[in-house]
Amino acid sequence: MRITHISDTHNKHNHLTNDLPGGDILIHSGDFTSIGRESEVRNFINWLKLRTNYTHKIFIAGNHDITFQSEKLFRLKSEWFDRKVYSDEGALGRPEWLEEILKNELDESIIYLENSSVEIGRLM
């Protein structure tokens, strides 16, 4: 089984396109965005969909992907940016657009893990 691991791409994942060897599993272990904007998340998901040289693509959110972490969203936006980047509704839970992406826009080859696991072949 061939596994490729990347992380901390901070919206620069497009620069890796020609450098990834392909294989069975691509794992991105967080910080695929700079601050978790909707446009950043959508761009990353679309990039994952185009990685057809991998059978499975697994990703988790990192500390920069703050819209995935609703409990931190309100506090971090004021600490990091000293201004409002998101509406206060994000502090009450994940933004609706993110829930919609995770529920409806991931194809069968893309797996998002949060407090969970996945078994692929004999690997877990």
Positions of the model-derived regions?
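Core catalytic region of metal-dependent phosphoesterases/phosphodiesterases
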Residues: 6-121
